[in-house]
Amino acid sequence: MPCLKITLAYDGSNYAGWQVQPEAHGPTVQGEVAAALKRLTGEEITPVAAGRTDAGVHARGQVISFSTRARIPVERWPLALNSVLPADIAALEAVEVAPDFHARYCAKRKWYRYTIYNNRVPDVFCRRYSWHLRQPLDVIAMARAAAYLQGCHDFRSFCAAGSPVRHFERQVQQASVSQNGPFIYFDVIADGFLYHMVRIMVGTLVEIGRRRLVPEAIPAILAARSREKAGPTAPARGLCLERVEY
């Protein structure tokens, strides 16, 4: 049975995250994709995603995988899916892969970007995709702090309390802060992420940008291995899964 790897983009604003869960309040991206697949194939398919994005988080390069008996040519899959998916979910690319391919477990690294709109006046067209902060932030200090997040660390301080994860070590290949006009971007590439990890990183960097913490506080926060030592969790709406590499 052929296995397909499909790249998706979606606006997560109206979804209770990627994963279908009994307690989910509202539709999920996985649920919408599964419903679209059933319409196309008649099969009950549970697509697997590279990143199980939270409620309100977006994606430009989410990757899913699934097996199907459908005889749709691989190059026609994006067009077929887009004909039955909601307007805020789009299939971008499809390729056939080995039967043992798994979108999550085969991923080598993921790139997330968090967007802050740093301006006194809000931008109504960006409000769903950025965190609006009126107070000017010290971007240079934030960039210095981000560099300390690179490398292999125990990121327990940057994991939401109550996470069932046992192993907190992750390898961060890149963590950087850049600015383009009123937009401040935090880009992070890692082999994996803990629950709310990127959003807690951003909340901590904003505390540094507000000069409530110094950049050199990051090593101590990492060493503490305590969620209480890091900053608040940034809103979901500014976060986007940009790309998954295999």
UniProtKB/Swiss-Prot annotation:
GO terms for biological process: tRNA pseudouridine synthesis. The keyword Isomerase applies. The active site is at residue 54. Keywords: Isomerase, tRNA processing. Its EC number is 5.4.99.12. Signal peptide: none annotated. Substrate binds at residue 112. GO terms for molecular function: RNA binding; tRNA pseudouridine(38-40) synthase activity. CDD domains: PseudoU_synth_EcTruA. The keyword Isomerase applies. It comes from the Bacteria. InterPro entries: PsdUridine_synth_cat_dom_sf (IPR020103), PsdUridine_synth_TruA (IPR001406), PsdUridine_synth_TruA_a/b_dom (IPR020097), PsdUridine_synth_TruA_C (IPR020095), TruA/RsuA/RluB/E/F_N (IPR020094). It catalyses: uridine(38/39/40) in tRNA = pseudouridine(38/39/40) in tRNA. Formation of pseudouridine at positions 38, 39 and 40 in the anticodon stem and loop of transfer RNAs. Homodimer. Belongs to the tRNA pseudouridine synthase TruA family. This is tRNA pseudouridine synthase A. It comes from Moorella thermoacetica (strain ATCC 39073 / JCM 9320). The lineage of its organism: Bacteria, Bacillati, Bacillota, Clostridia, Moorellales. The gene is truA.
